[in-house]
Amino acid sequence: MTDRLNIHRLTTETRNPQTASIHQADTMEILRIINQEDFKVAEAVQQVLPDIQIAVQFAHQSLRRNGRLIYAGAGTSGRLGVLDAVECPPTYSVSPDTVIGLMAGGADAFLQAAEGIEDSEETGALDLKTIGLTAEDTVIAIAASGRTPYAAGALKYAKTIGAKTVALTCNKHSLISTYADHSIEVVVGPEVITGSTRMKAATAHKMILNMISTAVMIKSGKVYENLMVDVHVSNEKLKERAIGIIQSITGVPYDKAKETLEAAGSHVKTAIVMLKTNSDETHAKALLKEAEGFIDKAIEQHVSKEKER
């Protein structure tokens, strides 16, 4: 058996001595055991914050160059990437191809497990070719084991193109880490149910992906204070949220916030700058464009220009 296939040496495949008798536990004890193990996940993530920071830097630079952040994974790992990617457009008003989640087997595999499809390195490379991977992109391959061929193939191909690459795994010295510019190896220990990496490993990866995409969007001016000022106003709930955001930042009454949001074409940042600078939509948009989308910079520029008059 090759070293690559000897999964029994992986931390994620070893037995957890704390859960060896879980089959004999009552319901509350089962839940307590799982909860106790889950506490270890956040601590493990804390240990790799410096590595996550580098991944954020890669992705942020890609977006500044009009590149993309691309997740690639199989099974649960692939689903996590898709989940993070699809939430970015409504939350931050980025286009659907700014953050992309690629999953072995495509959309069908998201709903129904297709375990065998992960064994093809060629498929990982092909999926990146299909979306036209460029050197401006950042690819984060996700695999709890650190040895999934689909993830390995994606990283190998991305390296040939010149894209920045990151391996996200739950095992030290993993195979896919050797194919990446940088790795995040978050060791959460053995699973509650041996080898069930949809549990602690997946939880850790979900936390890390949340951190990466959120930090990138903050650094891209999509957040002001702690508010999602680039929220895409696509339904009544989000419209009410947008009005609340405008009120919170500017202090205007509900009706004024609603009126300004409508005048700004439902663009929250424009409405905020309009109110903060007492300007119209055209001027507010020009200020935001000059400030690369950052509200505070747009307001500062306006104040500076007013002083020069």
Swiss-Prot record:
- Where the record annotates domain SIS, the positions are 59-222
Q: Residues in the active site?
A: E87 (proton donor), E118
Q: What class of enzyme is it?
A: lyase
Swiss-Prot/TrEMBL catalytic activity? N-acetyl-D-muramate 6-phosphate + H2O = N-acetyl-D-glucosamine 6-phosphate + (R)-lactate
User: EC number(s) for this protein?
Assistant: 4.2.1.126
Q: Which keywords accompany this UniProt record?
A: Carbohydrate metabolism, Lyase
The set of disulfide-linked cysteines is none
Q: Mention one GO molecular function.
A: ether hydrolase activity
Under InterPro entries, the record lists:
Etherase_MurQ (IPR005488), Glucokinase_regulatory_CS (IPR005486), MURQ/GCKR (IPR040190), SIS_dom (IPR001347), SIS_dom_sf (IPR046348)
Q: In which pathway does it act?
A: Amino-sugar metabolism; N-acetylmuramate degradation
CDD domains reported in the protein's UniProt record: SIS_Etherase (cd05007)
Biological process (GO) annotations held by this record are:
amino sugar catabolic process; N-acetylmuramic acid catabolic process; peptidoglycan turnover
Q: What does this protein do?
A: Specifically catalyzes the cleavage of the D-lactyl ether substituent of MurNAc 6-phosphate, producing GlcNAc 6-phosphate and D-lactate.
Self-association or partners: how does it assemble? Homodimer.
Q: What remark does the entry add?
A: A lyase-type mechanism (elimination/hydration) is suggested for the cleavage of the lactyl ether bond of MurNAc 6-phosphate, with the formation of an alpha,beta-unsaturated aldehyde intermediate with (E)-stereochemistry, followed by the syn addition of water to give product.
The entry sums up its family as follows: Belongs to the GCKR-like family. MurNAc-6-P etherase subfamily.
Q: By what name is this protein known?
A: N-acetylmuramic acid 6-phosphate etherase
Annotated source species: Bacillus velezensis (strain DSM 23117 / BGSC 10A6 / LMG 26770 / FZB42)
Question: Which gene is the coding source of this polypeptide chain?
Answer: murQ
